Amino acid sequence: MAGIWRLSNHWFVTRLNIIYGASMKYVCKKSSFKYGDCIIEIPNGSLGWCRDIMFSALNQIEALLSVTSRVFIIRFDSHVSGYSQDNAQISVFRRRLIKSLRRRYPDLLFGYIWVREQEKAKQQHYHFAFIVDAERVPSASVVLDAAIKTWERLTDIHPHVPKHPYYIVKRGDEQSFIEAAERISYLAKSRGKGYRPEQTKDYGASRFKMKAANDSRF
């Protein structure tokens, strides 16, 4: 059993736990992999990436594409004011954001994946990819604007929006799927993962299921 040590008033699991912990036991170092008929390139893949995180994201894209013809992928990053041992703030943020959007778009299908990371800073930060039914919102910016406002109200911190935060993936369009997958792969990088209490998750994802009658596999 790996031990733990105290550093800057926070508890961190040792590297042994990071490598073999529940969310880090499928670390790959391949620069690409096959998903259905698609070859997905992983930028800096040789540095390590988490297979379960990557496949959770791709599975959610596919699941939504089995019930709608196209989805927006929207990237969003956020910091918190101080370290916390759990991800409770993310749960509150997610609930409030979805509630806010569904007031205007009641039937909106809203998928997501988020990851928790911590490197040299004293507190963790988060990366998000929202996977949203593009048939039921007028634009991706509507979702991003709502996310920014929700996060600011919750934390009083302005989030970071990466360059080119929007992607659109169309059912049956292999190239759009590959491009979005390669962008989302940033969330799956192993660096920064694992620095958290054992019971706390490194990532979370929505749980949409594939509609069997309309399999979207490319």
Regions from the PLM with identified roles:
Residues 18-68, 134-218:
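Catalytic "initiation/cleavage/transfer" segments centered on a nucleophilic residue
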Residues 59-119:
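Signature for HUH/AEP ssDNA processing cores
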Residues 72, 124, 183:
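Residues that flank catalytic or metal-binding motifs in active/ligand-binding sites
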Residues 112-135:
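Histidine-centered divalent-metal-coordination microenvironment in nucleic-acid enzymes
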